[in-house]
Amino acid sequence: MGLTSQLIPVLVCLLVCTSHFVHGHKCDITLAEIIKTLNILTTRKNSCMELPVADVFAAPKNTTEKETFCRVGIELRRIYRSHTCLNKFLGGLDRNLNSLASKTCSVNEAKTSTSTLKDLLERLKTIMKEKYSKC
């Protein structure tokens, strides 16, 4: 009985420590995969890279990082659902971003300036590399 009461705090501590390790490790894996996909996409010469997208980074200052990632996901979905190019990469990028994004957001295309898909992906790559360096 004495051993069990001493063992419980140790087991709880180990559980907490490993959950923090796994969470940090997942962050590294997801970000690394996003950056790898962005590197592939931004080096491709493809007419889809010149498609117009809403400039989701031109959001108000109080927009959270999670909202920004959500907005990027919306634009990626709009592209890969309506065009047949780069579907595999854009779909995978969307799925990975979804794990870092808030669940709801909106992109008001009427009020936002436009950019190209290539510009959006280049800017996202810069943000993700910075985030990865802090992970």
UniProtKB/Swiss-Prot annotation:
Cysteines engaged in disulfide bonds, as pairs: 27-135, 48-85, 70-105
Q: Reply yes or no: does the keyword Cytoplasm apply.
A: no
GO biological process terms, alphabetically, are: B cell activation; cell surface receptor signaling pathway via JAK-STAT; immune response; interleukin-4-mediated signaling pathway; macrophage activation; myeloid dendritic cell differentiation; negative regulation of apoptotic process; negative regulation of cellular response to transforming growth factor beta stimulus
Any GO CC annotation of this UniProt entry: extracellular space
- Kindly indicate where the leader peptide sits in this chain: 1-24
The UniProt function text for this chain reads: Participates in at least several B-cell activation processes as well as of other cell types. It is a costimulator of DNA-synthesis. It induces the expression of class II MHC molecules on resting B-cells. It enhances both secretion and cell surface expression of IgE and IgG1. It also regulates the expression of the low affinity Fc receptor for IgE (CD23) on both lymphocytes and monocytes. Positively regulates IL31RA expression in macrophages. Stimulates autophagy in dendritic cells by interfering with mTORC1 signaling and through the induction of RUFY4.
Q: Which family does it belong to?
A: Belongs to the IL-4/IL-13 family.
Q: What is this protein called?
A: Interleukin-4
Give the gene name.
IL4
